[in-house]
């Protein structure tokens, strides 16, 4: 049973001058800020990442890049291409795509890593691209991994990647930042994977959805860098946009070891770079008055082995609850960017050779293994770890994503049960939708493979069964945004961008309105649909009454996690076609937010407004789409919103600050979206 304590609320204010580490890193990589502006959560900023990685999707990004009219990558040192997803596929079609990516990289002078060299995220870390206190992005959702080494890593969509290739920059809205304080020390044998699976379960009500997470507290120093990488990696499944660990002595020592092992003359792993990092680290720590949206705590010493599933990351239970159920398994997996590192392979090997001899994988069970990179596999071979795994009957796969993404050999078949040290167990992801998948640590996966059922390592090691203690954790909301009661420097408003946006609010009172509800999937791949038709089918899967309840110029208000689901850009463009200039929600899917701005649709997260409207209509008959007679005015120059009743000049019921929408972002909107902005920038530089 978990214990979550309720603690007092903290206040937060835009007027507070302190910055957290996330804001400091963004500040260092932002371009075009007005003089003296200090980046804060909510701000829309243009960013120039240190690096941008793409993998098998490099060719679609390249096609979009060329479609923008670009011919040369803006900064070849910024871009990294890796091949890691479908590396077992030897079909001519896939090999041709791989050849195209390699040729493009060679022509552009971009760093390229071929298939079977390793998973892109692992390469980014071990080759020193994702480096502490830098901003590194990738066109992949597990870019959060880089936070394990103190780099701010966050995903971008393909259009963003193409923009970075062409211009060196894209945009980002700085998310609310949640501070997660870790105390205590993990019990013997319990791993970073157990910690993040527990976090996903204990805080499984979207507490950190679309937040940047910063880990802090005395427990951090007791986690190895490999454990930090695992935790940061799965902050994606926790719902966060990044998961950042601090730069401390443990990390600096780890980098000194990497430098010692690196080939002489390595371009990025150098003693001088690590020394410079050590000098800079203190200044990049959070200020004492740094702002956080939430404060969470977790006592690591209260954890045990955790397993999530079946088919859900957020259903997490102690192994002591599952082991007695004798849940048989058919397949086990030790691989991926989550748990394919040397420490993970050694944890599994330690279970397999518990009594000095190598235990065999149970009859009828297939145990698949793959190192996160060729370098990791070489290290495992040199230490004898790989031989132990093979001697036990494990089935080796090449370094790559493979079964984790549902590609290649060893997928789950209908009726089968699998346990995996990967990051996602969504139904159908690792094979048949009629299979069941569980997630666990390498040690639990190995023990389960040996015994043929979900089992704790102690059952193989001959130790006492693990306890299932109450998890000691807490969460505190840090208050609402400050009222707009003080003077602030005016935001520059560009010609062609409205100084203020005003409209009547139309409430679509539902959480998790998905992209299929906004723009039906049956139209997604009909590229010749007229704008008028897009407007007519907008929101038809959500509410047929939306059409006659919403007029051009209205502002749509949605619930939490608006735009969840697929990455279809038409979810944004259909709303624009309907004449909606601005969508407000309690929160947005990150992909929808990016697609919205990239296609010139404005968005604002205003949970206080959503709460106000829900309270206003709490006793009214249910209505999916409701005209409210309530008006919102967004003063772009003042970075405030004002909500009034009856008319734009009526009774004021809400007035608060919002993030600054910088001139650089305004220019994207004025140019019709990110693609239009890139084309304009390329024309200007020609």
Swiss-Prot record:
This protein's UniProt keywords = Amino-acid biosynthesis, Iron, Iron-sulfur, Lyase, Lysine biosynthesis, Metal-binding, Mitochondrion, Transit peptide
Assigned EC number: 4.2.1.36
Q: Where is the transit peptide?
A: 1-17
Alphabetized SUPFAM superfamilies for the sequence: Aconitase iron-sulfur domain, LeuD/IlvD-like
Its BP terms in the Gene Ontology are: lysine biosynthetic process via aminoadipic acid
Look up keyword Secreted and say if it applies: no
Question: So where does [4Fe-4S] cluster get bound?
Answer: 337, 401, 404
> What are the disulphide bonds in this sequence?
none
> Which of the seven top EC classes does this enzyme belong to?
lyase
GO MF, one annotated term: homoaconitate hydratase activity
- Give the cofactor note: Binds 1 [4Fe-4S] cluster per subunit.
User: What is known about what this protein does?
Assistant: Catalyzes the reversible hydration of cis-homoaconitate to (2R,3S)-homoisocitrate, a step in the alpha-aminoadipate pathway for lysine biosynthesis.
Protein name per the record? Homoaconitase, mitochondrial
Q: What is the primary gene name for this protein?
A: LYS4
